[in-house]
């Protein structure tokens, strides 16, 4: 079974150097092993070797049997910076990603990062990433400094993504209400999934997929609670006029055309997502190399599916993420 891992993260060394320059709101220190610690409001990440050494990472993929990874940046993203520096960092990251792809394809493909705090600059950078760097789309965060992805300031970005058939992979970030999630790592364990669910539902009810039907949406972490809550969203559509204002079909009909990555390694949850969206819309994802991610767990969950599940179709196609790269 060919494996295309569409949910994983990489910090280009050039990006880490830029964070250390003193121009960023992000602070970089080091742990006892010398790994960079990336501090940003409300959280921090440990950048282990797999986060920042592409040769090391390629060796891991070869050992584990992953054919391709579609690499993306991760939190804190560039939108936490000033608009000008966000655009600088996004271009730097995307140039680094394009270089990795040019040198190491088909082992690696990539999605662009965007300076989402500046919607106009995001349009410009997505166009550059797709036309000049030949990246198939971008990863976007589930909110932008508290602003919903459904906000109309982002619609010019969606207009371009629709015109080009771009991939937009929604990845969670610090959610609204994060002040209630300061203990027990509740923000990534619970808050991330809540924010993904909220972003997807808000986009649908706002009419974004109705207006821009050619965007190829991907939701991380099996869509948060979307497969579980879709029936409730449909009942809202039937019960409340406001929920019908911008869309002509039930929310689930839009959401079933989206893609969902498998960064939830529970077999029953994976089967629910497959039942909801179809096997061809559920994509392999590991969240490597985060502490909570796992390539072996990703592989075990896929191989543990019932034999009737068309896993070869599901996890070898990698949707247009790779074929467009």
Tell where the protein language model's regions lie, with residue ranges:
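Helix-coil boundary/capping segments in enzymes
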Residues: 1-325
